Amino acid sequence: MGEALRGLKRTIMCGESRENNIGEKVTVMGWVQRKRNLGGLIFVDLRDRTGIMQIVFGEEINKEAFEKSDNVKSEYCIAVTGEIVKRQSPNNDMETGAVELKGEDIKILSESETPPIYIKEGLDASENIRLKYRYLDLRRPDMQKIFMIRHKTCKVVRDFLDENGFLEMETPILTKSTPEGARDYLVPSRNYKGMFYALPQSPQIFKQLLMVSGYDKYFQITKCFRDEDLRANRQPEFTQIDMELSFVEEDDVIELNERLLAKVFKEVGGIDVKLPIERMPYKIAMEKYGSDKPDLRFGMEINDLTEAVKNSEFKVFKGAIEAGGSVRAIKAENCATMGRKQIDKLQDFVKTYKAKGLAWIAYKEDEIKSPIAKFLTEEEMKAILEKMDAKAGDLILIVADKNNVVFESLGALRLHIAKELDIINKNEFRFVWITEFPLLAYNEEEGRYQAEHHPFTAIMDEDIELLDTEPGKVRAKAYDIVLNGEELGGGSIRIHDSKLQEKMFSVLGFTKEKAWERFGFLLEAFKFGPPPHGGLAYGLDRMIMFLAGTENIKDVITFPKNQNAFCPLTEAPNVVDENQLEELGIKKIEKED
């Protein structure tokens, strides 16, 4: 049984002791990292979230404490009182390596069984074990550094927004289901049998209502929930830095957030963000990089060869152009010697993005090698090489198809090759704003338009008339902030006119009745002098991944779910008692074999 503190107070953290503390009598508390018994002396490395302190116990220092210290084992939780002294053999690898603590008194606060994982940096254990024993995994110094970074990030964000006149306000977690996009997590109501709350996918509607209420600068750091298939680096519950402002346009929101990003990345990560951040229209991003989340740390931009081969009789090129598509290519420098097997793998790669194939031209020192050379005239080959600014040693990779297939496949291929060639500077942070997104996308299966972001996004002033005639060409007052090929956050200016909002719902295929059934409270609010407003939300978890230098979202969330949205620690979700279900008016339907 562990000893009680009985009024004993910790006076210093393990990682805080330095030479200027020599001579001080202190009390430290933490976990035993390791113990070394050298006969007349016992050395204990004691760890807390700030670091490690070496403690030395000896018969000459205090016999009782020396004998008691021999009983401690790895991960025992102990308290030690003694004097900080200069270390005879300094350890330059430890921040506290110049000093040690002479252990004069020890309390064993609690014992520990042998841990299923070793508490150290760079743990080599399976993800399932780490998540099952997450409370032990979180003791590791590299994990504790991550959560100190997370804390500091939230503090810097709060301080900055407070200094800029924002109010931190909370919005409901139990809210109304408005199914558009990802599935909602539903919560049954006990008072209203057969009815459900939804957990919010974002605070979107409530923060807009706060603008109507006159709270012109709102923010919160809040949980959001999406019941979707968990691709890499997705979690069913995640955290947003959410904000909304009244009486603003795009430039106002962007300028404020550039200053916020510069402050966060400098103060937390020591990273300089060059301002103003580059802005790139969606159309340019897709045409040059094949993605609305372009990684700008390397070149290999997509080039349009359609004009150069518009008269070609090569049926692959001709067919794509006649069908309204295009012929585009990327250039992989110094890759002309790539073998046939490697190129075959690249062809298989683009087919996963629905491309029918991948044409290639290897520009070698003494020849141009290509399986499509025989289908091209000398002038067409020359035009391609000139357009690609090709030099000896370059490999040109070409896709001819519908534009969306060309963009997606070449964009993915560009990233794939850059990673294979290891040409991405991992120490560089390249921000870019993507602007002028399409407002709508046509869903062929449902035969209707869907909002690219959400149905509350404002329309670019010059495109409003197109909403009636060519909805697919309408651009949104939307903006995403992208860092190194990852979306860090996104936002937009919102519609604040009830008639225009109703029209937007109509274009999306909502009847007036359906729109009012789902969003009537918002449309009603818009009758009472709503201000122009807009905002932005960051994925806090992804931001911390960049600042902490980890590629796994589970590393930055204290108790994450696994890839199947299951918690190995608590075994949630779990079966609940029948009487709980009965109280909620829910009956289980057994699966038929």
UniProtKB/Swiss-Prot annotation:
Enzyme class, broadest EC rank: ligase
Location of the protein in the cell: Cytoplasm
UniProt superkingdom: Bacteria
Catalytically driven reaction(s): tRNA(Asp) + L-aspartate + ATP = L-aspartyl-tRNA(Asp) + AMP + diphosphate
Protein name listed in UniProt: Aspartate--tRNA ligase
GO annotation (BP), single: aspartyl-tRNA aminoacylation
Binding residue positions for ATP: 226-228, 235, 487, 539-542
Disulfide pattern: none
Xref: HAMAP family: Asp_tRNA_synth_type1
Positions of region (Aspartate): 204-207
Matches recorded under Pfam families: GAD (PF02938), tRNA-synt_2 (PF00152), tRNA_anti-codon (PF01336)
Gene label: aspS
Main location (coarse class): cytoplasm
Organism listed in the record: Clostridium botulinum (strain Langeland / NCTC 10281 / Type F)
